[in-house]
Amino acid sequence: MQIKKNIAISESGYIFNPSSGESFSINPTGVEIFNFIKEGKTYEEIEQLVLEKYNTDKDTFDKDYHDFIGFLKQYHLLDYGEKEN
């Protein structure tokens, strides 16, 4: 799973999908996770990085991560290549 190549994101969390013309705003943690996915990091790598940085537990991270992935899927921002996380 990866972010589609044509999707643009600003440092402030503004996402633009040129294919649909839609734009979205995400919070700073969402920006980090978005960029980790764009870099090709695995779920496990992202989990470790987020748990080290933020005061949260694995269950909360897991729920929030999958909610975020659901958002990305809903707005067709993901591209599925070799494998899905």
Model-derived features: positions:
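Acidic, low-complexity/disordered tracts enriched in E/D and polar residues
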Residues: 1-31, 35, 81
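Long, charge-rich, low-complexity alpha-helical segments
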Residues: 25-85
